[in-house]
């Protein structure tokens, strides 16, 4: 029995990699008549570390599009087992460095030793296209004393591309 479980785990890691999806990905239109806002949002465009040094930490990078203002945002939500106190996010898109400041206003203890840090960052269309259409995108979360690298954003990037090519044209 143990051999079968080990083999099954090994096959799963080979086919799905060390980062698994987190949550159920979807796209929703979030309209609020009280605030007169209308956003098209990715929900749960995340990866989760699994069976490595990043075990069970979740990294979400959702695109938000303000339909009324015709502007885009990156909603970054990091749920980890320890604090980074994120100050900035650095992407490498085919080697080109793209740096975003990260607000220190959005931090919380989720419970059970889990912490969350998030921000909604404005992003212009040219920069968004660089991230979406680059051959390889990596990311570094720079904290006050530490940093953390994500070297495989292919699942997130694939969903960005689908969102950009199929969902956004309906509202532009």
Mark where each language-model region is.
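Short, surface-exposed binding/anchoring microloops in extracellular/periplasmic proteins
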Residues: 57-87
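Sec-dependent N-terminal signal peptides
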Residues: 5-16
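Internal interaction segment
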Residues: 96-172
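Extended low-complexity, serine/threonine- and proline-enriched intrinsically disordered segments
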Residues: 80, 85-101
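Bacterial Sec signal peptide processing site at the extreme N-terminus
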Residues: 16-33
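Residue-level detector of beta-strand face positions
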Residues: 49, 90, 138-140
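N-terminal secretory signal peptides that target proteins for export/translocation
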Residues: 1-2
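Solvent-exposed, flexible loop/coil segments flanking beta-strands in beta-rich domains
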Residues: 29-61, 66-67
């Amino acid at each position: 029995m143990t051999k079968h479980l080990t083999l099954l785990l090994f096959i799963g890691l080979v086919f799905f990699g060390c980062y698994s999806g987190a949550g159920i990905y979807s796209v929703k239109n979030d309209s609020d008549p009280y605030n007169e806002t209308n956003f098209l949002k990715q929900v749960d465009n995340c990866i989760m570390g699994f069976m490595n040094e990043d075990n069970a930490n979740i990294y979400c990078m959702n695109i938000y599009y303000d339909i009324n203002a015709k502007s885009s945002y990156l909603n970054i939500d990091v749920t980890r087992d320890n604090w980074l106190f994120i100050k900035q996010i650095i992407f490498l898109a085919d080697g080109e460095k793209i740096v975003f400041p990260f607000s220190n206003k959005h931090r919380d203890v989720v419970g059970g030793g889990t912490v969350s840090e998030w921000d909604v960052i404005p992003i212009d269309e040219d920069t968004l296209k660089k991230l979406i259409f680059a051959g390889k995108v990596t990311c570094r979360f720079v904290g006050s004393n530490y940093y953390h690298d994500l070297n495989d954003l292919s699942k997130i990037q694939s969903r960005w591309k689908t969102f950009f090519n199929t969902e956004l044209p309906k509202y532009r």
